[in-house]
């Protein structure tokens, strides 16, 4: 039986994700972001709710990406997630994409020319953002055309790159329905962005998400629930450059902007530049919010839930890797757990996220 | 003409304070806490409002105590404040007290025996709180009876101690009306505690404070407006012992208590012990809130306001000391100004507290 790995955020889980899981083959392992996501913001609902939605709709195992993998630029995000899936025994990597490309060929090229490609990046002008640089790299070495540039496209290329040398079969799955950033509501498969935007429109949420009740009943948050805390952090710390990825330049920009703004979006607008993209600034604000430091990744893999079929696989994996299924006095990953504590501050109904919580078990035939 | 110095918090200003100012002689200089007060909490209204109330009711000059003088145990508070008043040319120190004691004699004893008295403190058991120790010290060396122990009594003794060797005439003024901590409303002169407690009772506030409208119209805060920020600080910082007066023991106690409490008062209750008094814990929480460090005191004296009579005196003083009347790009005291920024976070209507603000001028005949 194939073991398919899928990297996901499910922010929130919707019919597009369900379709992706249906297209994937064999046992399906999802490596999912925890309570903070790649674009640098809190997830709309907590990791347990999102894991349960996934398990009720096709996933067999959901494991958690540590904070410092989940909140990273595309390359680090993909690398960290693919490493975990590979450790978990995946032989196939399935991912959504808007483009019909030969990703295996792209991975092969990267495997062959990784050094030249990395060297090429170094030669590019520093006025370009990192995404712009990688785009130029792919264009030069593979001839890909970025005219239809989309976030999933960039992520898919990052997966190809991350799986180079890993003996993983790549299975791109063409996305159905709305594009990633679409805020349109009138589509069969609404995007996660549209659902977050219209989360208070119950009818729309019921139409566009399976297991909708889980989503609707969970405490929902967005960046603005954390604005006061971020502002306080920036104002109260004389130095900010102990925080991961904060340099003196960005610290100064944040310190002078913070006294004039009233929301995270205003702050991001004021601080972002061509080189400091909005996504990068949002990630930096997330690092500041949770006071992130440069840290080692945890050794164990934290399991959020599984089906019976998934449980069989976990039993086998336990012999060779460290599976963390319940976090007690010894932390799994201090950084992620601190981030979770702070995530809880965004809404008084968010439950304890780690200590003593057991994986979700979905009883169904494998 | 006598120049009388008065140490005050005016939290808020009431008829008892007005009486004290009336009893004082000559030019009246008040050294007042800024936005955080000695017992370790945010002042109910900002320093500008409190200074204006004082200037409208008898004070000639109001200068600001730097944060690290204002939020300190009685001895350091008194010492820092008396030093500033002495620098400002005060020859008399007036203060309220419940006890008719010969404070000049007490100051004389301290002047003579300071070393023995300090050595005596060292011999006392560490299970005693600092206030308990100083109480024993005064009992042993001066025979004072502490049966009617009150905060003002302790402060008055601290003033006596602080003025030792300073050539300051001590003028104790017997308090009228309610005792310091009284929460009773039915008294001619209500205590500041009672007024804070019943701040939403407009009739009571009008009865017990002069210049009531200033108080009633100002944005009012209390500790609970800052609970979310303190909780966030404790949760997000792996180490707390970089904060002034936070040691490993108190840091651990705070870290384990914070996940179980829902208010500052609950937190103080959980963390305080016989040795860590509630006042000390509140001060520590204030240090954490504003991220205070051990710092040097500022050189200049920050003037919050003056009458015409006060202005004459300031002109003379300017020749020998640094008077800061407007804070621009160069900070007066970074710690105080950071504390003020954070004070502002407690209520969205609190105005900028430092940058570009000029002293209050009250036009009246000297």
Curated annotation (Swiss-Prot), chains A, B:
- SUPFAM superfamilies xref list: Nucleotidylyl transferase (SSF52374)
**What does UniProt give as GO cellular component?**
cytoplasm
One GO MF term, please?
A: ligase activity, forming carbon-nitrogen bonds
Q: Which residues bind ATP?
A: 7-20, 96, 152, 175
Q: Which reaction does it catalyse?
A: cytidine(34) in elongator tRNA(Met) + acetate + ATP = N(4)-acetylcytidine(34) in elongator tRNA(Met) + AMP + diphosphate
Q: Which domain of life is it from?
A: Bacteria
A Pfam family matched by this chain, by name? HIGH_NTase1
Protein family (similarity comment)? Belongs to the TmcAL family.
PANTHER family, sorted: TRNA(MET) CYTIDINE ACETATE LIGASE
- NCBIfam families on file: PRK13670.1
Q: What is this protein called?
A: tRNA(Met) cytidine acetate ligase
């Amino acid at each position: 039986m194939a073991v398919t790995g899928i990297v996901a955020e499910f922010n929130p889980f919707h019919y597009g994700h369900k379709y992706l899981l249906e297209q994937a083959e064999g046992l399906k392992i999802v490596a999912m972001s925890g309570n903070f996501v790649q674009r640098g913001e809190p997830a709309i609902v907590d990791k347990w709710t999102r894991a349960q939605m996934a398990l009720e709709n096709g996933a067999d195992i959901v494991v958690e990406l540590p904070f410092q993998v989940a909140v990273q630029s595309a390359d680090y995000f993909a690398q960290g997630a693919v490493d975990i899936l590979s450790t978990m025994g995946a032989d196939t990597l399935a991912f959504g994409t808007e483009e019909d490309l030969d990703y295996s060929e792209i991975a092969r090229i990267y495997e062959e020319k990784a050094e030249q490609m990395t060297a090429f990046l170094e030669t590019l002008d520093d006025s370009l953002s990192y995404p712009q640089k990688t785009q130029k790299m792919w264009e030069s070495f593979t001839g890909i055309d970025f005219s239809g540039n989309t976030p999933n496209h960039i992520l898919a290329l990052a997966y190809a790159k991350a799986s180079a040398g890993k003996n993983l079969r790549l299975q791109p799955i063409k996305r159905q329905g709305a594009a990633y950033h679409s805020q349109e509501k009138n589509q069969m498969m609404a995007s996660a962005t549209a659902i977050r935007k219209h989360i208070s429109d119950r009818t729309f949420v019921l139409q566009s998400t399976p297991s909708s009740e889980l989503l609707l009943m969970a405490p929902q948050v967005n960046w603005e629930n954390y604005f006061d805390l971020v502002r306080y952090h920036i104002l109260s710390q004389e130095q900010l450059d102990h925080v991961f990825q904060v340099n003196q330049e960005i610290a100064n920009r944040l310190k002078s902007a913070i006294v004039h703004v009233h929301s995270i979006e205003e702050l991001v607008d004021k601080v972002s530049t061509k080189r400091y993209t909005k996504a990068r600034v949002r990630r930096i604000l997330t690092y500041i919010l949770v006071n992130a430091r440069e840290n080692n990744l945890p050794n164990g893999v934290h399991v959020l839930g599984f089906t019976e079929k998934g449980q069989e696989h976990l039993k086998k994996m336990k012999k060779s890797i460290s599976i963390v299924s319940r976090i007690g006095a010894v932390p799994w990953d201090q950084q992620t757990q601190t981030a979770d504590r702070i995530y809880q501050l965004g809404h008084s109904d968010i439950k304890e996220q780690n200590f003593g919580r057991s994986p979700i078990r979905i009883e169904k035939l494998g």
